[in-house]
Amino acid sequence: MDNKFYVNTNGERNIWSTAAEENMTTAASSSQSQPPQMQSSKFHQPENHIHINDGFSSGAFDLQTLESSFRGLSFADSNVHQNGNPILPAHQYNQVFNGGGGSYGDGYLFPPSGSYHHYELKDLQRFNQNQQRLSYQNDYVNQSYRYDTIGGGNGMLNNSFLNGVPCASRNNVSDYYTNIFGYGVNNSWRSNEGCTYNQDQAASSMENGRGSYFSIATDRVWSKELEKTIFVGTKETIDMIFDGLIVGICELMVDPFGNDVVKLLIGKCSSEQIILIVDVVTRHISKFVNICFNPIGTLAIQVLLTSIHERANNQIPRIMDAISSVALQLTRNTNAKYVILACFRMFTSSQCRRLLEVVSQHCYQIAIDQNGCCLLQQCFDKERVPNHEIRQRLISEVIEHALKLCLNCHGNYVVQYVVELDNQHETDLLVNKLLRNYAHLARNKYGSHVVQKLLKLRGIDSKLIVVDLLRGIDTLLLDPFGNYVIQTAWFVSKEDVRQMLRYYIERNIRLMRCNKFGNKILEKLNI
């Protein structure tokens, strides 16, 4: 092989050039003799180069040449070389100096120290260690300190890096490590071995190590640890966490992780703290509405209402005023309607007076809305709203607007639900309210369902409704919806009423045979 350096197109020396030739060049330039062991082999192993030998003259040592030799032998990491840090395996770093080095050896390589560079080497080593510690602190804050899937890392906590760190600081660094998933974990949470569990210290250390309590509460992993602290925490712990979260509690209520923290914290709060929460939540009514509209925010508001009901009754008027001012908006939202339902369930009619007035005055607008329709049906349920006065007031408003509601795609369900309550007094009021309009309702797609529902009730006199239908019998026999009402009236009526219906059917039988809806009646009744 030609004893010359070969240079490729990138300006790098060919890896087949011998280290011996390079060492000879170095020796010639520095007027120093090479040790015999370095001349005895054509390809030198890195271990033969990494030792401290006083035979080397510090003034003659060329770190750049030695590094280029290692790179030529493919023992240097090109990525690290670009950053100015030559790399060797971790166990070889410890042969050079006592410090740093992890499973991938992200430490610093120092040249063999001679008498000339002895103090300079110590200063450089101390500077690099300080830089390494500072880098670790910055990496932890920026969450850039990571392990790969096989446990490799920069090794900041391994070997003898902490030898020069005082015990207190060393423990402060070691208490937090980063697992293979990139999430910071506190050792004190994983095990109680060798330490006394203290909630205050744990809560304080979490905030100091991870950031503010707000950041902890919104983190997928740390929020669970914060929940554990709240669950078993003392009053001092709860106060500390509450002070850290109260400012951003509106944002936490709609956060997927912070929501659970807030709900658990509200259950542990004192009456004074609940007052502060009410102050913050109701300060901006638009924020309050957005929380109620949110699928998880509405749950937090319901938990707050429960806590107010149990431990802060003096705050009921304040929270009810806030809810009543936006009640119409809340009733029309699929999530916020449960806030209204929770108020009717927990509070008395006197406490809900203003809210009940708002809902009653806008009963028709609420009933013709899809979500409002569902809300009213749930309000009629005795189990959901035990207060009879509230239920009776809402039912009365529905009966008052029954005619218009029967003609609506959503409102007709509210009227049918009132019928299904099977309250004789309320049913009689509804039947009388719709008199002289049954023929009109029977020709409507939605109203026909209400008329059929009333005809099937056993507690009322169906003859009253059938007689009212006879006012428009000629059109009903040929109507797409009215024909179903006539069929139902036939089957639920007694014989005397059927004879009346038969008379009108036979009078219009020719027209009915020419109409597909009239034919349905004839086929169904076998006429």
Swiss-Prot record:
Residues 24-41 have a biased composition (Low complexity). GO terms for molecular function: RNA binding. The keyword Protein biosynthesis does not apply. Pumilio repeats lie at residues 205-243, 244-279, 283-321, 322-357, 358-396, 397-432, 433-468, 469-503. It is found in: Cytoplasm. Residues 22-51 are annotated as: Disordered. Keywords: Cytoplasm, Repeat, RNA-binding, Translation regulation. PROSITE patterns: PUM, PUM_HD. It comes from the Eukaryota. GO terms for cellular component: cytoplasm. SMART domains: Pumilio. One of its GO terms (biological process) is regulation of translation. InterPro entries: ARM-like, ARM-type_fold, PUM-HD, Pumilio_RNA-bd, Pumilio_RNA-bd_rpt. Residues 184-527 form the PUM-HD domain. Sequence-specific RNA-binding protein that regulates translation and mRNA stability by binding the 3'-UTR of target mRNAs. The pumilio repeats mediate the association with RNA by packing together to form a right-handed superhelix that approximates a half donut. The number as well as the specific sequence of the repeats determine the specificity for target mRNAs. PANTHER family: PUMILIO HOMOLOG 14-RELATED (PTHR12537:SF186), RNA BINDING PROTEIN PUMILIO-RELATED (PTHR12537). This is Putative pumilio homolog 13. The gene is APUM13.
